[in-house]
Amino acid sequence: MLNHLQKELNELVNRGLDRTLRIAVTGLSRSGKTAFITSLMNQMLHINRVDNGHLPLFDAARQHRILAVQRVPQLDLSIPRFDYEGNLNALSQDPPMWPQSTRGVSETRLAIRYQRSDGLLRHLKEKGTLYLDIFDYPGEWLLDLPLLDLGFEEWSLELQRQLNGTHAALAQSWLTKVAKIQLTDTADEDILAQLAKDYTDYLWQCKKQGLHFIQPGRFVLPGELEGAPALQFFPLLHLSASQWQQLKREAKSESYFAVLTKRYEYYRQHIVKGFYENYFETFDRQVILADCLTPLNHSRQAFSDMQQALHQLFRNFHYGKRHLLNRLFSPKIDKLMFIATKADHITTDQLPNLIGLMRQLVQEGGRYVEFADIATDYTAIASIRATQQVVVNQNGQSFKALQGIRSSDKQKVTLYPGSVPGRLPSADFWQNQKFEFDQFEPRRLEQGENIPHLRMDAVLQFLLGDKL
């Protein structure tokens, strides 16, 4: 007990003296969180192994003020260790493979030994150590955070309002089955389980169509909860306001309506709230990743769906400046970075447009954050660079193109990926033409080589530069 209290006290002191920095790497499914964390660790661990030319925009590395970086044991021994070595092995195979997507929570901690450059503490101690804590977790689980503010009826009505376009078409079969049950009847466990499975199948179909706003997120990535009654419920999207009120008055405790309500509340209070309290209340800085290219290949609704999902997430993070007292007792996010991933899937002249799309994606959330007066930045990166930009001469003209291994057929290709719109086109655009941004395979990582990237050094400078 005393050892536990001592550990917590030491962590409070370290946080207050800026010795510990906890970074939330946030993003929806397939946005590149695992690749981002793997690359960030790799770039840091390779500092001083070469001339640091891989990080020209990271001042502390370029000025050789970082003395050493090593991975150290994390504080919470109940959380699995981030599989950095496994991810490197995947990239080192022949042929190389992308690291596996996140299927559960994991954590890593880096100790960064550095030479102080300025600030009050440089007079007290020339050298310092910054402990960097980074968490990885499934993007699907993030989608459940908005449920913290919604009861069963509110949640169902929210999804009812969004039931249009592709969502409505894919949900039709499941909706027909739900409409056939009498919600005041005594609940049959087998029927509930089957309807919950049908709802889960609908969510999977949404994912395949490039849609991101799917709830509950754990239905498509349940982890240890697979098959548990806690995941055997579903929203009621066919009820009117008067029907809701009638069911609340008349439905008995063993009815379908009551059981669905209880299971939703259990899920919200025990699973979602526990996840939020354990991982999201003590972050200092936040990175929000978004793949803005892949949704463009599908439809305007796919992009708008991703936009809505991210806006919902902003409600559940604490933003504000970090002064000494709130660093100790009320940690808040004081820096926020919006990152468009897969910047290596387009040519460099299209990067401003990609960043412009990212700005449009988070505009509403950005306005909210600006009110809290914290530092924000927008950029585009490739955590693990899969292509090389080349210049192609054709018919007497030169233009930029990409060279890499295309994922669809595993062939080495040289192609022009096309233009990125600076703003999201109208819905009419997709009726006449469409975007076709290819996916690429990673290049093989040689032993001892740092992971090739685009602008990870700019990310490190923004997140860590003022602490080193």
Predicted regions and their residues:
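Short secondary-structure boundary/capping segments
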Residues: 40-45, 147-152, 303, 352-358, ...
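P-loop (Walker A) phosphate-binding loop of NTP-binding proteins
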Residues: 28
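GTPase G-domain guanine-specificity segment
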Residues: 345-370
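Conserved glycine(s) of the Walker
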Residues: 31-33
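Short, conserved secondary-structure transition motifs
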Residues: 339-346, 379-390
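Post-Walker A alpha-helix
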Residues: 36-37
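Switch- and interface-adjacent substructures of P-loop NTPase systems
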Residues: 4-13, 17, 43-332, 347, ...
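Hydrophobic anchor at the beta1->P-loop junction of P-loop NTPases
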Residues: 23-25
